[in-house]
Amino acid sequence: MKTLALVVVLLAASFSIHAQAVTSVYTPLDDKKCKTLESTDEEGGSYKGECRGVGGYKLHVIEGDLRQTVTIVDPKGKEHPLEFWNLTGAFNAVGETAEWRMRGKKPIALIVRLTVNERVDDPAYVKGYLVVAKITPEATCVTEFLAPTRSHNYEARKAADKSATRPCRFESTPD
């Protein structure tokens, strides 16, 4: 009987740890709200900005050749480039806001909108994808590149919440 009671207590404790609600916290990626680290107008221009994140994390927004990407900077200062240009070679831009998926006070994933110009001959033709990156002690990397659908945001959150078990889409190279 004591063994059964112990098993029930351990299962209940385990369930409460894993059942902790996942919430969202948002970081603006707008260059007016982020600190400019580098900027030049030479050769089409480039930009690197630092945006405040959560839990000691920061985001670097990087632009070059009319393409943007995000690098996650962990609390120890280690950079984890997400290298959005590996997802699409087309001109693109990150959205105005990044969504951190949080378990308690700890980020477990990041969702960023990536607007992609898929027709070189028609700059007005763009599609809004959602990029999901996992944040784990083992790896911080892109796990999903979700095409637009009616339930786009819901699907991205669902993928983010399960991203810890997903493989990286590609290996990133540290800066």
Whereabouts are the PLM-identified features?
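Alpha-helical interaction segments
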Residues: P75, G89-A90, H152-N153
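Arginine residue identity/basic-tract feature
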Residues: R52, R67, R101-R103, R113, ...
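Charge-rich, low-complexity N-terminal segments
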Residues: T3-A5, F15-F84
